From Swiss-Prot:
Boundaries of every Core-binding (CB) domain copy: 1-72
Origin species: Streptococcus mutans serotype c (strain ATCC 700610 / UA159)
Species classification: Bacteria, Bacillati, Bacillota, Bacilli, Lactobacillales
Domain called Tyr recombinase: residue spans: 90-245
Main location, first listed in the record: cytoplasm
Subcellular location: Cytoplasm
UniProt name for this protein: Tyrosine recombinase XerD-like
């Protein structure tokens, strides 16, 4: 059997490291099988792999099956034996997953911090867009709001879940109005962070909440180009990592 292992390796174009790996796996196989391949001996070999990790088991079985086919092809064996790997590699956990944010929809005292969080999670708005949002750009009766900046105008549908939180706000010039002026980004981050801490989500940030919006939209089946437009991005490049899984 050792002689045939050498011939098998010589027939393949392998790197030195791959050759060593094949040789090691096949020598172990030969120690258990001996000079004669039988179904019972193959079962013994399978049992010897029981405690190995799935990836290691898969590698060894692949090497042995290639070797068994080589033996059959060269008429060393009168039939082709094949070991079936019944185990599969565990599925990789997606890198980006939805987080349970149901707590954001519960009624609490800090309505402004809550609304900021919901505007990010439900519409994917950035902090800069939120502090510049005016009531004249919000049409509750049509369930739409308009985001206006120097380069582009976006019309976004207001989700039904978000409507009650907007309807309860006092209408002035800005959605978050500071005597007719917009608040600073620092004010927004302070309100948001205070609110998130109060609902035990201090690990979240404006960026992570926006990421949750992206993940949720992707899981709903929104195409990457449609999501690019919804977010007002110039290109889908920054979204590609979320669509790889």
């Amino acid at each position: 059997m050792i002689t045939f292992i050498s011939k098998f390796l010589a027939s393949k174009s392998l790197t030195l490291n791959s050759q060593k790996s094949y040789l090691y796996d096949l020598q172990q196989f030969a120690e258990i099988i001996g000079e004669e391949v039988t179904p019972n001996k193959l079962k013994l070999y399978e049992q010897s792999l029981a405690d190995l990790k799935v990836s290691a088991k898969k590698r060894k079985i692949s090497a042995v099956n290639q070797f068994l086919f080589f033996l059959y092809e060269n008429e060393v064996l009168d039939r082709f034996y094949k070991i079936k790997n019944k185990e599969k590699l565990p599925l990789l956990t997606p890198a980006y997953q939805e987080v349970d944010l149901s707590v954001l929809y519960r009624k609490i005292g800090d309505s402004k911090g809550q609304l900021i969080a919901l505007l990010i999670v439900e519409l994917g708005l950035s902090p800069s867009e939120i502090i510049q949002l005016k009531w004249e750009n919000i049409a509750l009766e049509f369930q739409v709001l308009t985001i206006v900046n120097e380069k582009v105008m976006r019309i976004l549908e207001i989700p039904q879940l978000l409507l009650p939180y907007l309807e309860g706000e006092h209408k002035a010039v800005y959605l978050f109005d500071n005597k007719g002026e917009a608040y600073s980004r620092q004010w927004l981050f302070q309100k948001l962070n205070y609110y998130l801490a109060s609902v035990d989500l201090s690990q979240m940030t404006a960026q992570k909440l926006r990421e949750q919006y992206i993940i949720k939209e992707k899981n709903k089946g929104t195409a990457i180009l449609d999501l690019t437009r919804k977010l007002g991005l110039k290109s889908p490049v920054t979204l590609e990592k979320y669509f790889k899984n």
